[in-house]
């Protein structure tokens, strides 16, 4: 196999809590005000990273954000010492404090859109940080995400970092959660599939219940920034019915790897036309497109959302087959589990293995295996240019495990966010983490 896909997972932050901040994300809303366990959440995510690294998959780590975000509270009129600001925010606007304490950066599928060098005109890997302007708590992640990505992929000979698109709803961008790439070998040209929920300038169908967070205009802008060939680019609209059913990002209804697209019957608007366009553009590249479409009569959209069947990772093994990495919730859902057992038993199917991970702490906030990782396709030279301190191995796993066990609380509720001691704990831990991952001073409190 030429080239490879690296997955960079987000470490769960120390303020991981359940506040129901994400309208359209059913798990987030349904678990509002539950007591969280940040330590368990971080260890669950870390265990997945280590397990996949042990199986030979390239696995990296991206850091959490500094939260509660005191600079934002200051910008919004709260004055005094950090302790005074936390007290005032908790007293006068506890919802705002919760939003500015969110650990949602763990879901690095929303960190950026990434295009490999094989698809870009300048033959470099392109990153565009997502503006995430549909949700206040996520829109504040841009600066630190940019700094973390630049510290991880620093060599300008190989990597290009674009600033986020304008902070306006016309260019709403949710990153790689609405982006797939299909192709053959990872270091060969492929077809990039941008998925949007609505078009600002062209109109058309839109969801009625929940917001369409990604616009066509944002996706087109990213394709231009990444210098992609229009003949190898596809823009498709997510089915509004799916969005209204709780599919807030495309990675809740579809996942791709190499030439395979694993998706629901109702993932896209005009789905047969979408699949035909992808197939034709891949054929020009001499590649055979494989669509694994899950019928609604077997798995309903509700079943898909409840189990997060499609919010999975589809990874290529050494033998050429693929493994589907799913959350424990898939095993607990009888119809979904029966389908997966049948799928992996088909000798002619590209997917012949299913791996299950317990990610319950993240799942209760609406984030499965696919949400937790940012895919970065690299060739050998580009891989050698990646910050090695961020790549998962036994030593890093052991260091991060000790770091989490030392710094993270095992219980957190909304009222704890006003505790000034928690803020001190966060700053101490993150300062240490930047040394472990060799990131430099990426946080505002470090400058």
UniProtKB/Swiss-Prot annotation:
GO terms for molecular function: N-succinylarginine dihydrolase activity. It comes from the Bacteria. It catalyses: N(2)-succinyl-L-arginine + 2 H2O + 2 H(+) = N(2)-succinyl-L-ornithine + 2 NH4(+) + CO2. One of its GO terms (biological process) is arginine catabolic process to succinate. Pathway: Amino-acid degradation; L-arginine degradation via AST pathway; L-glutamate and succinate from L-arginine: step 2/5. Catalyzes the hydrolysis of N(2)-succinylarginine into N(2)-succinylornithine, ammonia and CO(2). Its EC number is 3.5.3.23. Substrate binds at residues 19-28, 110, 137-138, 213, 251, 365. Pfam families: AstB. This is N-succinylarginine dihydrolase. Belongs to the succinylarginine dihydrolase family. Signal peptide: none annotated. The keyword Membrane does not apply.
């Amino acid at each position: 196999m030429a080239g490879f896909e690296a997955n960079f997972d987000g470490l769960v932050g120390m303020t991981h809590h359940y506040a129901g901040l994400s309208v359209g994300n059913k798990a987030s809303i349904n678990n509002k005000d539950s007591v969280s366990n940040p330590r368990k959440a971080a260890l669950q995510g870390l265990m997945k990273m280590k397990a996949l690294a042990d199986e030979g998959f390239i696995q990296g780590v991206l850091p959490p954000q500094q939260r509660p975000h005191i600079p934002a509270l200051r910008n919004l009129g709260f004055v005094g010492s950090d302790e005074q600001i936390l007290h005032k925010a908790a007293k006068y606007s506890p919802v705002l404090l919760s939003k500015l304490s969110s650990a949602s950066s763990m879901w690095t599928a929303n960190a950026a859109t990434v295009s490999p060098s094989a698809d870009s005109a300048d033959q470099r890997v392109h990153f565009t940080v997502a503006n995430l302007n549909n949700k206040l708590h996520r829109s504040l992640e841009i600066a630190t995400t940019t700094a973390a990505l630049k510290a991880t992929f620093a060599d300008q000979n190989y990597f290009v970092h674009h600033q986020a698109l304008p902070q306006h709803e016309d260019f709403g961008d949710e990153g790689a959660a609405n982006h797939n790439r299909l192709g053959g070998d990872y270091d060969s040209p492929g077809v990039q599939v941008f998925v949007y929920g609505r078009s600002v300038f062209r109109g058309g169908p839109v969801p009625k219940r929940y917001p369409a967070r990604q616009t066509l205009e944002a996706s087109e802008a990213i394709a231009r920034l990444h210098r992609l060939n229009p003949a190898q680019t596809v823009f498709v609209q997510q089915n509004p019915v799916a969005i209204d059913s709780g599919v807030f990002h495309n990675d809740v209804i579809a996942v791709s790897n190499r030439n395979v697209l694993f998706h629901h019957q109702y993932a896209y608007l005009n789905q047969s036309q979408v699949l035909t366009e992808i197939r034709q553009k891949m054929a020009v590249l001499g590649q055979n497109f494989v669509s694994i479409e899950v019928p609604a009569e077997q798995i309903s959209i509700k079943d898909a959302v409840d189990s997060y069947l499609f919010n999975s990772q589809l990874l290529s093994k050494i033998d050429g087959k693929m493994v589907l990495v799913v959350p424990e919730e898939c095993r607990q859902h009888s119809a979904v589990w029966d389908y997966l057992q049948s799928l992996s038993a088909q000798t002619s199917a590209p997917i012949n293995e299913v791996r299950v991970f317990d990610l319950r702490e993240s799942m209760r906030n609406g984030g499965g295996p696919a949400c937790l990782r940012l895919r970065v396709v690299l060739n050998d030279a580009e891989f050698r240019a990646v910050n090695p301190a961020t790549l998962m191995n036994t030593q890093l796993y052991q260091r991060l495990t000790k770091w989490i066990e030392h710094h993270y609380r095992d219980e957190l509720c909304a009222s704890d966010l006003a505790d000034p001691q928690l803020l001190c704990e966060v700053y101490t831990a993150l300062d240490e983490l930047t040394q472990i991952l060799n990131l430099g001073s990426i946080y505002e409190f470090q400058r």
